[in-house]
């Protein structure tokens, strides 16, 4: 990238267009931001089920004057449900957002596609095979259902439903870019102890506890995992992962221009299928390392604060910056409390900020139609049947079909049970301009409704 690249790009683009005007350019980066034209940009999404559920409206506000989008790679490859039904629900919801915005998202594909289970370099893959069998993961059936049920036009629609809050575990942590003095850490009224010194060490002093910076061995180990990351910050964790809901507080000595971070939900995450399988099949305990623990971070920079979450290559803000009143050279009591839905931040007993934990919709839908039919695609993320009240602006025939993918969150296909998760089609009755469809728990549904003939 840079001026030389952009100069050559424009020269090549201009000449190719002169000779082959029918060729469309798909760039793998938003080169148009630097004055380089492209008809389409290839965007990739690899993340957790929750990420896709929370970003179903990702393209709603996309600049329609910019290049079209090719979602070239999209898959759940982090978290607890890779290759399983719940991951397919998240991907299905994201695809519904794409379908609503197909004026700008003109192409989409799952990646990777095929996996020889004896020579695997990546997981999950859409279709798995060995020398004798093949199977599709649950996501395969989502793409099949969506591909077989496309309408001619997207219909304006609205849906309402509950929320699914992002599941979090773990207690507090502390991070700092220089030595940090603290004392009297308390969790739900009892002393909270440091359980994991991920970066740096904690030393007892006459004045309390001193969080020291990482030693050279810790820096080297961390740098080997995340080469691009800052290995100079200390990082220690209180308590265990099952200590999630409650109140944490501790006294922190605030120096002039102090910078430190108070972590919330300091638990290990599953970064890949291979880590998960080592835990499940080999009984290998997940390591406690600074790259694997991803709390929400209450960042304190002097008198300015924000709450952020870990993200590659930068942290994502959950709040705008806000000010707190602290006096340098003194201890101040910092704390938080959470019930799994809200986080409340305190300084010296005074509430500073109340934030909702990120959440996605429990119900997501998209509606398309043809001359003769209405097609409704819907995802129910909830663990209960959802009686969905459907209201249409046209009259429908009573008989309709539902293509359904459902089961338990962790259901997956294997060579022993290759079709444990597979779509089925059932005939139903009772459709009209207003009727109720009971969406099964953890399900993707495609309803095909026949319009009544106009007289």
Describe the predicted segments one by one.
Residues 95, 101, 109, 123-194, ...:
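Catalytic cores of secreted or luminal carbohydrate-active enzymes
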Residues 361-396, 402, 445-446:
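Carbohydrate-binding surface patches
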Residues 420-455:
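C-terminal beta-strand-rich structural cap/linker in extracellular carbohydrate-active enzymes
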Residues 250, 331-338, 343-347:
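Short tryptophan-centered beta-strand motifs in secreted/extracellular beta-sheet-rich domains
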Residues 215, 219-307:
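Secretory/extracellular carbohydrate-interaction modules
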Residues 310-335:
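Short, aromatic/His-centered strand-loop micro-motif at the edge of beta-sheets
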Residues 348-360:
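Short, solvent-exposed beta-strand-to-loop segments that form ligand-recognition rims
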Residues 10-150, 383:
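Catalytic-core region of carbohydrate-active enzymes that cleave or remodel glycosidic bonds
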